[in-house]
C-alpha cells in the first residue's frame, strides 16, 4: 500500500471501545460455537442437510476466533500492527472469509427452511447428505475465491513508527473490495427477507392445520436468522455507504473512522449470536443445552449410599433418562436429532 495514500488516526474512542468488545465476542463466541461444534461432532445421532449447513456456519464462526486475539492486540496498541505483512494479509483474509462464509450459510439455512415450510414436497428437501456436503464445499470454494484477493497485496500502511493493518483504504473507494462488501449484504438480505416473509405467511395460513408449538418454533427460527443477519451486517454497510457518499471530505475524519471501525466490529457479533440460530433450529437442541448445563452443575457426592442414590433417581439419572425420552420422540420431524447423554 502506498504510504502516502493513507492517514493514521490514533483515536482514543477506537482504542477504548474496540478491545472490550472484541474480548466479549471472543469469549462468548468461542464458548457458544465450541459447545455447538461439540454437539455436532459427538452428540448428533442423525445428520440431515440442514444439519450440515448449520455445522458449516459454526465452523465459519469458530474460524473467526483465531483472528480476534490479534485484532484485539492491534487496537490495544492504538492501531499499531506488529506482526508483519504476511500475518496482516492472513488475518484480513480470514476476517473477510468469516464474514462471507457466515453470510452464505445463514442465507442457505434460511432458504432450506423456506423450502421445508413453503414447498414441503419439493425435490430440494430430498437431497442426500452427500449432496448437501458437496454443496457446502462448492460454497466454501466460492467464498475463498471471492476473498483471496486480500492475500495478493500488502495492506500495511507505515508512517513513522506506526503501522496500520486495514482492508479498507479510508482515503478512497476500494473497487472490488467495496463491490464485494455491498453485494455480500444486499443480495443475501433480499433472499433472507423473501424467505422470512413467505415462511411466516405460509405458517399463518396453515395455523389451523398445524400444531401451534411447531408453528411458533419455525417462525422464531426464521425471524432469528433475519434478525442476526440485519443486526450484524447492516450497520457497517450503512457506515461504508456514508463514507463513499461523502469522500473525499470524510477521508481522514476521526468520527467517520470511529464509526466504520465500530460498525465493522458488529460483523464479529455474528459469531456470538449464531448460537441462537442453532438453539432455535431444532426442538432437541435446547434440551441438549439444558442437559449439558444441569450435568455440569450437578454436585458429585461419592459418599452417598445406594439407598440415597435410589431416592434421588429422578435427578441423578436425568441425563440417561433423557436419552430414553429422546428415543420415544424420535418420530417427530426435526432438523437433527441430538444425543442427550452428555453426563
UniProtKB/Swiss-Prot annotation:
Protein name: Hydroxycarboxylic acid receptor 1
Alphabetical list of Pfam families matching this protein: 7tm_1 (PF00001)
Protein's UniProt keywords contain Transmembrane: yes
Extracellular compartment residues: 1-21, 71-90, 153-182, 242-259
Gene: Hcar1
PROSITE patterns in alphabetical order: G_PROTEIN_RECEP_F1_1, G_PROTEIN_RECEP_F1_2
UniProt keyword Disulfide bond, yes or no: yes
Disulphide bridges, residue numbers: 88-165
CDD domains: 7tmA_HCAR1-3
A GO molecular-function annotation: G protein-coupled receptor activity
Amino acid at each position: 500500500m502506498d504510504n502516502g495514500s493513507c492517514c493514521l488516526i490514533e483515536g482514543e474512542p477506537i482504542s477504548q471501545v474496540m478491545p472490550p468488545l472484541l474480548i466479549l465476542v471472543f469469549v462468548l463466541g468461542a464458548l457458544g460455537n465450541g459447545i455447538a461444534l461439540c454437539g455436532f461432532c459427538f452428540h448428533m445421532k442423525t445428520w440431515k442437510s440442514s444439519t450440515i449447513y448449520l455445522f458449516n456456519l459454526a465452523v465459519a464462526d469458530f474460524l473467526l476466533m483465531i483472528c480476534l486475539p490479534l485484532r484485539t492486540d492491534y487496537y490495544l496498541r492504538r492501531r499499531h500492527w506488529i506482526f508483519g505483512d504476511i500475518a496482516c494479509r492472513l488475518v484480513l483474509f480470514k476476517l473477510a472469509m468469516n464474514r462471507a462464509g457466515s453470510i452464505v450459510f445463514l442465507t442457505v439455512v434460511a432458504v432450506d427452511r423456506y423450502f421445508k415450510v413453503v414447498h414441503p414436497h419439493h425435490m430440494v428437501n430430498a437431497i442426500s447428505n452427500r449432496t448437501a456436503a458437496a454443496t457446502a464445499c462448492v460454497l466454501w470454494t466460492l467464498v475463498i475465491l471471492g476473498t483471496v484477493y486480500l492475500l495478493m497485496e500488502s495492506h500495511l500502511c507505515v508512517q513513522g513508527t506506526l503501522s496500520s493493518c486495514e482492508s479498507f483504504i479510508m482515503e478512497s473507494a476500494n473497487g472490488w473490495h467495496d463491490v464485494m462488501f455491498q453485494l455480500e449484504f444486499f443480495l443475501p438480505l433480499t433472499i433472507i427477507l423473501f424467505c422470512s416473509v413467505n415462511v411466516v405467511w405460509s405458517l399463518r395460513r396453515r395455523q389451523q392445520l398445524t400444531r401451534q408449538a411447531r408453528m411458533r418454533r419455525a417462525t422464531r427460527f426464521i425471524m432469528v436468522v433475519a434478525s442476526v443477519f440485519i443486526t450484524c451486517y447492516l450497520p457497517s454497510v450503512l457506515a461504508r455507504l456514508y463514507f463513499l457518499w461523502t469522500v473525499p471530505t470524510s477521508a481522514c475524519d476521526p468520527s467517520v473512522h470511529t464509526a466504520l471501525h465500530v460498525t465493522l466490529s458488529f460483523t464479529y457479533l455474528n459469531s456470538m449470536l449464531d448460537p441462537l440460530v442453532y438453539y432455535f433450529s431444532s426442538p432437541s437442541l435446547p434440551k441438549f443445552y439444558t442437559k449439558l448445563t444441569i450435568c455440569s452443575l450437578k454436585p458429585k457426592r461419592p459418599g452417598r449410599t445406594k439407598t440415597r442414590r435410589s431416592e434421588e433417581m429422578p435427578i441423578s439419572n436425568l441425563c440417561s433418562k433423557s436419552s430414553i425420552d429422546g428415543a420415544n420422540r424420535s418420530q417427530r420431524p426435526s432438523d437433527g436429532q441430538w444425543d442427550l447423554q452428555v453426563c
